[in-house]
């Protein structure tokens, strides 16, 4: 109980004061624990990923995640046909991972592959900047060029303007074709024996009537297949040894938040 002095100043009994101090200490402790817990949770879900020393931005990660999301979903559904759409990403599958953990893993693998393509292209001098930001800059320049041509009444083939997804897909294919057709790349040149062997391993047809052709007529297609296979092998090997630095648990939680 509190009593009033003649001066109007309130005093607190010692017992009550002690109880008040205990409550205050407990309150501060609870707040501190909550803050620390929140800080630890923020640390756990913080986004951080580098590939071969290159920092991956959230924008780049999400862009790649969206790219692989459909195929990942098909893979998960092939394992569990009856899983609902709401539970698809939180269900645990045979590999011991949840759907969103598997999606995070697939996203990182795709990022490794794409960075391998860009690193190879930079090493060959096809591009100057192998980063995601470099790709965005090239896209802006391409879109600006197309816009100016349209304003001048000039012919523009293909799209009037690229989206990020479309431009990245176009550029990855372009860089592959550029490497494959670069005569200075010795790994893209094959002996007659290699060409003949690849031709003999399959049947080759052309046209709607599916007319079978000999090597002289199928030669360009045979060499193209050999080059594509060699390029894929080279790129996948480079991606496989890429150094990845990041907390997969945090990446998985970040991935889940995007779904």
Language-model regions: role of each:
Residues 1-64, 100, 104, 222, ...:
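Gram-positive cell-envelope targeting signals
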Residues 19-20, 40-43, 50, 69, ...:
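FKBP-type peptidyl-prolyl cis-trans isomerases
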Residues 98-115, 129-133, 161-170, 186-193, ...:
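Soluble non-cytosolic domains of exported or imported proteins
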Residues 160, 181-213, 227-259:
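Acidic/polar surface patches and capping/hinge elements
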Residues 177-179:
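Glycine- and small hydrophobic-enriched segments that form the cores of compact globular domains
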């Amino acid at each position: 109980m509190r009593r009033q002095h003649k001066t109007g100043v309130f005093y607190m009994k010692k017992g009550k004061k002690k109880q008040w101090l205990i409550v205050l200490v407990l309150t501060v402790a609870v707040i501190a624990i909550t803050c620390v817990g929140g800080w630890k949770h923020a640390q756990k879900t913080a986004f951080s990923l580098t590939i071969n020393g290159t920092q991956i931005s959230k924008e780049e990660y999400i862009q790649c995640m969206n790219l692989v999301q459909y195929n990942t979903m098909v893979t998960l559904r092939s394992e569990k046909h009856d899983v609902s759409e709401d539970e698809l990403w939180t269900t645990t599958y045979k590999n011991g991972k949840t759907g969103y953990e598997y999606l995070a893993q697939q996203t990182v693998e795709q990022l490794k592959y794409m960075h391998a393509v860009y690193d190879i292209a930079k090493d060959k001098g096809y591009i100057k900047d192998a980063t995601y930001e470099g790709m965005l800059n090239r896209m802006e320049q391409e879109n600006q060029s197309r816009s100016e041509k349209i304003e001048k009444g000039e012919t523009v083939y293909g799209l009037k303007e690229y989206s990020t997804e479309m431009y990245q897909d176009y550029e990855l294919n372009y860089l592959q074709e550029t490497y494959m057709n670069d005569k200075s790349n010795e790994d893209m040149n094959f002996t007659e024996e290699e060409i003949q062997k690849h031709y003999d391993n399959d049947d080759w047809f052309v046209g709607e009537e599916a007319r079978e052709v000999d090597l002289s007529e199928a030669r360009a297609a045979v060499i193209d297949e050999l080059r594509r296979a060699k390029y894929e092998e080279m790129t996948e090997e480079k991606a496989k040894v890429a150094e990845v630095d990041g907390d997969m648990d945090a990446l998985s939680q970040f991935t889940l938040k995007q779904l």
